[in-house]
Amino acid sequence: LYGETTGSDITLYTQGDDVKQEQIYLPSNSISIYEVCITGLCTGGSSGIVGDYKTNRIMGSLLVENSGGITKTESLDTDLGNSGTTGNISLDVSTSNIFSVQCSASANVSVNWSAVVKLYINQTKVEI
């Protein structure tokens, strides 16, 4: 997933496709472990210093009910290293089987974000 933002929120896109928002669709009646490795690299902006960065690894679980409702448990958010000012990372879920990676840059800071998302999914035919 990839995206660039300056002082605003963004949902990351697949392979740099900025036309459609990338949302990861999860199957109903499933439990998943997620692992998200994400990097943010400052490319400028009136308040940004080129080369500032942020790296995180986030892990947790996602229980998806038959209705599409998701219970997200974030059990590990590891700061792997950072320098200067970049922004914030959040993981979002909806009530329609959707999981997404969202980032925001600090005010007047331009940041390129990149994430690798791994999902380990166990699905059943029994309604949860």
Task: List each language-model region with its residue ranges.
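Residues within well-ordered beta-strands of beta-sheet-rich folds
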Residues: E35-C37, V116
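Compact beta-sheet-dominated globular domain cores
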Residues: N56-L62
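Surface-exposed ligand/attachment interfaces on beta-rich extracellular proteins
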Residues: L1-S32, T39-K54, N66-S110, V126-I128
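Edge beta-strands of jelly-roll/beta-sandwich modules across compartments, strongly enriched
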Residues: V109-V117
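Short beta-strand-to-coil "C-cap" segments at the C-terminal boundary of structured domains/repeats
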Residues: V117-K125
